[in-house]
Amino acid sequence: MSEIQLRHDWKRDEIEALFALPMNDLLFEAHSIHRQVYDPNEVQISRLLSIKTGACPEDCKYCPQSARYDTGLEKERLIEIEKVLTEARSAKAAGASRFCMGAAWRNPHARDMPYLKDMVREVKSMGMETCMTLGMLSPDQAGELAEAGLDYYNHNLDTSPEYYGDIITTRTYQDRLDTLSNVRAAGMKVCSGGIVGMGEQATDRSGLLQQLANMEQHPDSVPINMLVKVAGTPFENLEDLDPLVFVRTIAVARILMPHSRVRLSAGREKMSDEMQAMCFFAGANSIFYGCKLLTTNNPEENEDMTLFKRLGLHPEQGKYATIEDDKAVFEKATAKANAIKDKQSSAFYDAAAL
């Protein structure tokens, strides 16, 4: 098999041509590349905690954490460090290798930085990788977090540059690119992806992946989120995205960015086991683990581990999460999969989802 060539000069029409391939051809190409770089049966597991919820001043149309929309979400202040550590211990015990902390901010304030750095240091002392998503970062803030030991910083591009203005007006596309540049310059790893199912056109999905793949250095982690339509947000009544379009997006991301972790992110709660299996085959090799993604639902741990067992997958580093390996748990997960099999629907990505 030929050696994989990393490219940073993808043209839009080249990417659109990949999306247009017959499904079997696309999946074959993506999976072949995936096998060359990664163990195809290993999935990296992260746990995500909202450390500050709601009252965000931004106007992202998909997000229930925006103060501009009445979604019934109760806002919370920055939580105490000990609560963060309790959640991190639980995550590690359940098999997560990375702990992600998200805050619904436009950007962190100077008064927040000491607490954030302490969170990073304490979680790292447990032997876990750390990730944060706090909004925009200045070069100095990125440097402070890097010095504290933060491994990853998430800041998504959300969609293509052309469609971006229809999604958010309070932060520019260049603002997002600048934050990613600050993160990379500080020596941290970049986590950046986007959301599909927001009413975008096919060319916008190509445009999003083009932006990511043409960065000077590919993101280390690329989360692909499916919109979860939340009542009270402007996007609550959008039509569902075809599940196979989502699978195609995963596959094209794997082809364009062979060495990046492609994360099957928000939206798994509404995906059938069969759809998730196709995503793993297409090149997804990272998930969020636990019953919540910031403010939205996520499959329970035992359901994920039951699915892993059925598919012959294992968590990164070969560490299995705790699972009640009994008939009742298996039957519960199977029943849920059957119940939603014919109800494929879009799922939601939060403002700080990774």
Swiss-Prot record:
Coiled-coil region: none
Positions bound to [4Fe-4S] cluster: 56, 60, 63
Radical SAM core domain mapped to chain residues: 41-265
Top-level enzyme category: transferase
Cofactor: binding details: Binds 1 [4Fe-4S] cluster. The cluster is coordinated with 3 cysteines and an exchangeable S-adenosyl-L-methionine.
Keyword entries, A-Z: 2Fe-2S, 4Fe-4S, Biotin biosynthesis, Iron, Iron-sulfur, Metal-binding, S-adenosyl-L-methionine, Transferase
Binding site for [2Fe-2S] cluster: 100, 131, 191, 263
GO MF, one example: 4 iron, 4 sulfur cluster binding
Disulfide bonds: none
Keyword Metal-binding: yes
Role played: Catalyzes the conversion of dethiobiotin (DTB) to biotin by the insertion of a sulfur atom into dethiobiotin via a radical-based mechanism.
Complex and partners: Homodimer.
UniProt name for this protein: Biotin synthase
Lineage: Bacteria, Pseudomonadati, Pseudomonadota, Gammaproteobacteria, Alteromonadales
Gene encoding the protein: bioB
